[in-house]
């Protein structure tokens, strides 16, 4: 059976939780689905505004609620705003992240790549949340400048 579109799957999961499907939440989901990659709140809000007038604080509250509900997740990048995307329970695919410290581009990584780190942490009693952070990397486009800077 094909996986439903992320917005429809997210709405189903919200209703199953007993959450209300408000217009701002729906707009945030639709906006996020329309954007490439891992947008930050400014990018999400700009896309939400295309769907109808919405205050920035409302967008923040909707993102916060959808993250708390496990519908969305966010990743923290070096000294930059959080980036948002649909959670694995919506897409059916868990992933980790690598973020270029030069340009900020984000690459999705299969979670298996971090399995040794997960096992190392779990053996010591830690519960890693590897999808919530990003490995700091230098992408191929930024590598020449990185080398010139001696990094």
Write out the residue ranges for each language-model feature.
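Short coil turns linking two alpha-helices in DNA-binding domains
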Residues: 40, 55-56
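Non-DNA-binding regulatory cores of transcription-related proteins
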Residues: 68-151
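Short acidic, hydrophobic short linear motifs in intrinsically disordered regions
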Residues: 39-48
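Short, Lys/Arg-enriched N-terminal segment that forms or immediately precedes the first helix
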Residues: 4-18
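Pre-recognition alpha-helix immediately N-terminal to the DNA-recognition helix
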Residues: 26-31
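Short, basic interhelical loop/turn and adjoining N-cap
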Residues: 50-54
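Short capping segments at the starts of secondary-structure elements
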Residues: 21-23, 34-40
């Amino acid at each position: 059976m094909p996986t439903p579109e992320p917005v429809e799957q997210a709405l189903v999961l919200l209703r199953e939780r007993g959450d209300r499907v408000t217009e701002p939440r729906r707009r945030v989901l639709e906006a996020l689905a329309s954007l490439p990659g891992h947008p930050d709140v400014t990018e999400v809000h700009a896309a939400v505004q295309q769907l109808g007038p919405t205050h920035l604080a409302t967008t923040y509250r909707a993102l916060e609620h959808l993250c708390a509900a496990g519908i969305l997740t966010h990743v923290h990048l070096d000294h930059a705003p959080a980036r948002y995307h649909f959670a694995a329970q919506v897409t059916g695919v868990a992933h980790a992240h690598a973020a270029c410290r030069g340009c900020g581009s984000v690459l999705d990584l299969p979670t298996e790549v971090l399995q040794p780190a997960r096992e190392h942490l779990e053996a010591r009693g830690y519960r890693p949340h590897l999808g919530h952070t990003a490995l700091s990397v230098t992408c191929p486009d930024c590598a020449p400048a990185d080398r010139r800077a001696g990094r």
